[in-house]
C-alpha cells in the first residue's frame, strides 16, 4: 500500500525502528503487558513488518497496521489499518440476510492518549476509507468497539458510519459496530 497523506498526517508502513514506539502504543491502548512482554511484542512486530512487506510483493490486500505520523514533527502518534473480520455480523439487523458469521473488511485505529481530541483518528481513518473505496473498491468497511468507548463511537459517527448495537453480550469487543457502505 502506498503512503497516504492528509493535511496533517502521513500514513505509512511501519519500519523496524518503530518497534519501541509501537510497544508503548500497545500498552497505552490495551494495558501494560496485554500483548506480552517487550521481547514478545518486538518479535510480533518484526513478523508483522516482514509479513506486510511479503503480502505487498504478492499484491495481496494491505491488511495490518500503518503508522500515523504528524507531518509537522514526524512524530509517530498512532496506528490505523485494515483487518479481515470474520465475526457474527449476522446478529445485526442490517446483516439479517447473511449467515451468522460473515467476512468483512474491518478498520481500526489507536492513538496515544495525549493525541486524543485533535481529530487525528478521524483524519487517518477517513484517508484509509477513501483509499479502500477508491483503490481497493471495497463494498463495505466496518469498525467495532465496546459500548463505553465513546471516543471511537464519535469517530465512527464523524466518518458517516451507520451504528448498530450487538443485541447479545458476546463477543465483548463486538458491542457497537460502525458500518459504511461504498456508494460510488
Label each region the model flagged.
Residues 135-144:
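Conserved GNAT acetyl-CoA-binding A-motif
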